[in-house]
Amino acid sequence: MAAAPQSTRAGLGDRIHNYEIWGRLGEGGMSQVFLAKHSVLCIPVIIKTVRPEIGVDSTGAHRVLQEAKLMARIPSPRVVRALDAGMHQDRPFLVQEYVDGIDCAELDRRRRTALGVGLPLWFVCEAMYAACEALTAAHQTGVVHRDVKPSNLFGSPQTGIRLGDFGIAMTQAHAAHEVSGTIRFMPPEQLRGADVDRAADVWGAGATAFALRYGRAPFGSVAELLDFDKLPAFPPARSPAEAYFQELVGSMLEKDVARRPENLVDVMRHFAAIGGMLRPRNRRTQFVYVDRYTFQVDDCVVHMRTGDIVGAEADAIVSSANHHMKMRTGVGEALRKRGGDVIEDEAMAAGPQPLGSCLATSAGSLAARNVLHAVSAWNETSCVGRATQRALLLADELGHKRLAVPALGTGAARVTMETCASAMMTALKLHVVLGGTRLRRVDVVLWDQKDLDVYREVAEECLRGDGDAATVDIGLPAEEVEARPEAATCIDASKTGPR
């Protein structure tokens, strides 16, 4: 795929040091965020810098490098990694890990729109376990995040949840007298401009858990937030597990700082306990091997075959799209030739699309109802996981039950077949396991038998998974010690988090 138009790079040029810039993903009051790739490793990265008009000595410029330092010092796999930082054309920049998936706020919002349901409680608890693990690591290195919220929990079906955006984070020693953050997830003391410490992150995590489960912030207005007599508006608990969850989250949302949990270590264990009780325990029971090229995960059949995808019988066909939406090569060209130029015209009318996005158009004269244009890769750089998640959510939003998909990004963008299959199938598995999806069949259609066999092998591994352990290994018997029935045997389940 070609690089993004120069206009989207906002004067940064084609590259910063070893990073080739694709284009701008978004911007805030003082900062801009770009998608790029390492020129040698071909891995996607996120580059954050300040807007061109912001002076190099400004608060915003200082924060970019401060964010890089704070992220880099936190030793946790649950924190988005800082990979590089420095100055470029008198502008500070931060290079950070790209998480190939969507954030929890988008996942929750789109499920509610498409399916009329939010996230299952087990998933909320697992996400919060990861968030608390990240925050605990931050606190143990003296860092207070100060902006914990669903949109800062970045989820990859392959690697799990990571906490990101440390843009207003501060060290414990300097976290004082500054009102910054997102009001809906901000504790009262932070809103008042008082000194804040890790207790602010305990509140932020509680507000995030509340929002992920119930689709709204715990307080509807600033007045409610500041009123010490106003409690979070929990709906009636539907189960003992949910009552347990509400008790835990309620303690995190205590307006009196002294009554909140002192840290997130015990909170993390409680989330682990709830998630462990509720999660479908053994994913092997949800996987059915139908035949060599057909599997079933829960109620969704996944079938893989060779052939021409343009003739697929499906409600929607996914196209491996480029960011400018032209359909002149690969699967896109085949769909345009069979379905008509109207498909390309509709896609291009929406303008260039960012990597990882997915856009729906009509299907022209194809048998399907829609074509879903998944912008999944660029020059060996894969965003296939994020694009697949959005394609699946879009299919649910459109009410589709059957999809036909190619191997995304493996053509002009040169993503390997294994990389593609892993990203697509882990995204599909998560989509199905979360529950509620309308999808009942996904047909993977490839041209070449050799490629199909490679894809099939990875797909089975991803869809089958390794299951949860049926037993707990508590260690080998001690040598030369007589086993006695009155001896103590204890497994401390509080020390085992969700897998």
What positions do the PLM features span?
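Conserved short submotifs of the Hanks-type protein kinase catalytic core
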Residues: Q89-D103
